[in-house]
Swiss-Prot record:
Its main location: cytoplasm. Residues 289-352 form a coiled coil. The lineage of its organism: Eukaryota, Metazoa, Chordata, Craniata, Vertebrata. Component of the CENPA-NAC complex, at least composed of CENPA, CENPC, CENPH, CENPM, CENPN, CENPT and CENPU. The CENPA-NAC complex interacts with the CENPA-CAD complex, composed of CENPI, CENPK, CENPL, CENPO, CENPP, CENPQ, CENPR and CENPS. Interacts with MLF1. This is Centromere protein U. Expressed at high levels in glioblastoma cell lines. Up-regulated in GBM (glioblastoma multiforme) tumors. Significantly increased in both the tumor core as well as the contralateral striatum and cortex in gliomas. Phosphorylated by PLK1 at Thr-73, creating a self-tethering site that specifically interacts with the polo-box domain of PLK1. One of its GO terms (cellular component) is nucleus. It comes from Rattus norvegicus. Residues 101-115 have a biased composition (Polar residues). Belongs to the CENP-U/AME1 family. The modification Phosphoserine is found at residues 105, 110, 114, 130, 133, 135, 186, 224.
Length: 410
């Protein structure tokens, strides 16, 4: 892991040369007294051809730095580290290395300057790595080196924080790579398949500007992550109010500002202020929505009242128009009612008269010799019988009058 972290640094090629020189000088000073000297991974073998190596590197993008993805599964073997180091260096870097080999005094001067710069930077102590962790890491590296590079998932916050530490904070003893059982390949033995694999790894890795920065710890970190920013896209344009826009902008501003503040007490005060203002805005939004709902209901009621009033006016006009017809129908009804009563009375009279005549016929059949006697009760019958007599008398008078006129003319 130390070898992988030693390659993750940003800056210009000059800064990389100074840090590499610092690591090499520190390793030489610390291991001067040791008899068995380790073979440096970054030293080129004598059998390699520099011109062919430069031609291969010119095909790559110049001044391209290798930066592995920020997650715990990105473990590389020393072979892959060596290939990444060779591919990430430019021809100008190789020429700088050759010039350093020719001028050792300049190398020592640059090494002293880099040592002074690194001494000014704060360092933190690292926990020693046990042999068991070394063996497990070697096994993991062997298994990972066989597999094809796959698309990496975004890193978690703890892994990003642990892997994003710069090499300037590490001691010089942790920068030196460990030996493995694999032989050290040269730059000439690098095959096109390895180059294509390296290109795919470079394409997969995210750009440094797009990496997620870990949030600073605070008491309200969980609350800030679970806060819901209002989405105005789902609402209609007529439903969006000024308070919705204000609340959305206020939440975004709070999240951006809280990330920039480092003090925990300030974060707590900002969070309290934010929650109070947010509560007030939400309460105002609810009241405005209730007011809008009441206004809608009031508008509906008023429209219904207007419709009913208009209907009432129409009915009144229709009643006024139909009132004469009602009077005519009333008179017709009264007339028909009178005729109905008269018909009932005449029907009753005829039925009684028929019954009387039937009784008279029965009496005459029983006693035909008996004389008829008339009293007051039989007056209607006498009048009915005298109608023919009175008619004959009137007829005779008319004949007598006409005869008198004829006699006077003669």
């Amino acid at each position: 892991m130390a070898a992988r972290r030693s390659l993750r640094y940003s800056g210009d090629p000059g800064a990389k040369r100074s840090r590499n020189t610092l690591g090499s000088t520190n390793s030489r000073k610390q291991k001067a007294g040791q008899k068995p000297k380790r073979k440096d991974v970054f030293d080129f073998p004598n059998t390699s051809d520099v011109s062919s190596m430069l031609r291969e590197l010119e095909e790559e993008e110049p001044y391209e730095t290798f930066d592995p993805p920020l997650h715990s599964t990105a473990i590389y073997t020393d072979d892959e580290l060596y290939k990444h180091c060779v591919s990430s260096t430019s021809p100008a870097t190789h020429r700088g290395k050759e010039s350093r080999n020719l001028n050792p005094s300049e190398n020592e001067a640059s090494g002293n300057d880099s040592i002074k710069l690194s001494a000014k930077k704060p360092r933190r102590k690292l926990e020693p790595i046990s042999d068991e962790s070394d063996s497990s890491e070697d096994n993991v590296r062997r298994s990972v080196s066989i597999e094809r590079p796959r698309a990496r998932k975004p890193p978690a916050a703890p892994a990003a924080a642990s892997s994003s530490s710069s090499p300037s904070e590490r001691p010089a003893e942790q920068v030196t790579p460990r030996k493995t059982s694999f032989p050290q390949p040269s730059a000439v033995e690098e095959t096109p398949a390895a180059q294509s694999q390296l290109k795919t790894q470079k394409k997969v890795r995210p750009s440094p500007g797009r990496r997620k920065r870990p949030r600073r710890g605070s008491t309200h970190s969980d609350a800030s992550e679970s806060m819901h920013i209002l989405c105005l896209e789902g609402k209609r344009q007529s439903d969006v109010m000024e308070l919705d826009v204000v609340l959305s902008a206020f939440e975004r501003t709070f999240l951006d500002y809280k990330q920039r503040v480092e003090s925990e007490s300030c974060n707590q005060a900002i969070s309290k202020f934010y929650f109070k203002i947010k509560g007030e805005l939400i309460r105002m939004l609810k009241e405005v929505q209730m007011l809008k709902a009441l206004k809608r209901k009031n508008t509906k009621i008023i429209s219904n009242m207007e419709k009913k009033r208009q209907r009432l006016i129409d009915v009144q006009d229709e009643l006024i128009r139909l009132e004469p017809q009602l009077k005519q129908l009333q008179t017709k009804y009264d007339d028909l009612k009178k005729r109905k009563s008269a018909l009932k009375n005449s029907k009753h009279f005829l039925s009684n008269l028929k019954q009387l005549y039937q009784d008279y016929s029965n009496v005459r059949e029983e006693e035909p010799k008996e004389k008829e006697k008339y009293d007051s009760s039989s007056l209607p019958a006498l009048l009915f019988k005298a109608r023919s007599i009175l008619g004959a008398e009137k007829h005779l008078k008319t004949i007598n009058y006409h005869l008198g006129k004829l006699l006077k003319q003669d």
